[in-house]
Regions:
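Charged, alpha-helix-forming regions
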Residues: 1-399
Length: 399
């Protein structure tokens, strides 16, 4: 069945009217005292999670001022940096501040779940960014947000409209629930992976020899390069983070390479590359082949990633120094044992991190299915209503 046929069957001959958000919803305006909230029901922009992942408990609860009240069924949206896609369908009552929009339905032909799905669409976040104000810390325009159009099936027949919306929400919830289950399982597997990694890389006193990295490996600094100096090519330019900053036509590292980000927020980040790369604001570690396998050293360092991040120095732009890594002690079991450990950890790593196999791949596929069906289920023919946003509605709930 084509997407068009599916929608026609779902609507069963009913019309769809596109309405401005301000015609069917409003900003909550009621205020509550700080004493009425706690870490569980206070929602600030910082404890709304990116990419539609809901919310987590707040580490901070205000003690003064008045808070915006939210209720079950309200949609809360982080209004700072809209591109982070912070959105949550409230299942409880609580309070928030002016950095979070509380959107409450007012139309009888609109369900909270349907409103949440409509505002979870990438098109909404793109619209919000398009009209956002501020360069460094963009903030959504509240008046423009209320002009955003959402489709309402047969708005003059609330019973039929809510039934159609319920079916749309049911279909989309099926994918989100499955993704949540897979994510929970992936979290459990990562904990299991970390446990086995700790066990495999834990050696008793006297079991193996330990040496400073500077005695058993060569350290090489990256080469400065600007984007303007790059030539056409597909070789990753690796610097101070987990992903390439751009691509180049030449490489300065070949084969298995351990990379340590030198400066910035990711200073000390350990990564492993087994392809030609161009290394810039970072340094690479090259162990002696007769006693250490590069991938084994990578796993040893990656297992201590938190400790390595703690080695950062500098108040402005944090950085790590080669000489500190040269003094870092690593175990040196026999090469055959290193190979065995690497094989086990690589398999675990693929199952928990690879986007080509295992749970990460399954989660990615479910997310793509969800996005496909969300786009399909909201791709109604666009016949906007002739009614504008009710006067004054856009100012409700201003902080």
């Amino acid at each position: 069945m084509s997407g068009k046929d599916f929608l026609q069957k779902l609507l069963d001959g009913e019309r769809v009217e596109w309405k401005a958000l301000g015609e069917v919803a409003e900003y909550a305006g009621a205020r509550i005292d700080p004493g009425q909230v706690n870490q569980e029901n206070y929602v600030g922009v910082d404890n709304l999670l990116q990419n539609r992942a809901g919310k987590t408990h707040s580490s901070y609860v205000p003690t003064e001022g008045r808070l915006i009240e939210y209720r079950p069924g309200d949609v809360l949206i982080g209004n700072i940096r809209p591109y982070l896609k912070k959105i949550w369908l409230a299942n409880q009552s609580g309070g928030t501040n002016g950095d979070v929009l509380v959107i409450r339905r007012t139309h009888p032909s609109l369900s909270p779940g349907y409103l949440y799905q409509a505002l979870s669409d990438d098109k909404f976040f793109a619209y919000n960014m398009q009209h956002a104000k501020g360069a460094k810390m963009p903030r959504g325009d509240k008046a423009k947000i209320l002009e955003y159009q959402i489709p309402i099936p047969c708005p003059d027949n609330p019973k039929k409209s809510l039934a159609i919306q319920s079916e749309i929400v049911r279909i989309l919830d099926t994918f989100t629930e499955l993704t949540a289950e897979l994510t929970t399982e992936l979290t459990a597997r990562k904990k299991q992976y970390n446990y086995y990694r700790d066990r495999l890389l834990r050696f008793e006193d006297g079991e193996v020899e330990w040496k400073a990295l500077g005695d058993v490996a060569e350290f090489r600094r990256g080469t400065a390069i600007t984007h303007e100096q790059t030539t056409t090519g597909d070789i990753p330019v690796v610097a101070n983070g987990p992903t390439p900053i751009y691509f180049h036509g030449e490489s300065n590292r070949q084969g298995e390479t351990i990379v340590i980000a030198r400066s910035g927020a990711y200073a000390g980040y350990v990564s492993f590359w087994n392809q030609p790369i161009f290394l810039t604001d970072a340094f690479s570690i090259h162990p002696r082949a007769d006693i250490l396998k590069p991938k084994f050293v990578y796993h040893v360092l990656q297992n201590k990633q938190e400790n390595i991040h703690a080695m950062k120095k500098g108040a402005g732009v944090p950085h790590v120094r080669v000489k500190e890594f040269e003094l870092y002690d690593v175990p040196i079991p026999p090469l055959a044992e290193q190979a065995r450990i690497v094989a086990i950890l690589d398999k675990f790593d693929a199952l928990t991190n690879s986007l080509t196999e295992g749970l990460p791949r399954e989660i990615e596929l479910r997310q793509k299915q969800y996005a496909y069906y969300r786009d399909l289920l909201f791709s109604f023919p666009k016949f906007p209503s002739s009614v504008g946003v009710p006067e004054g509605r856009s100012n409700a709930g201003d902080a």
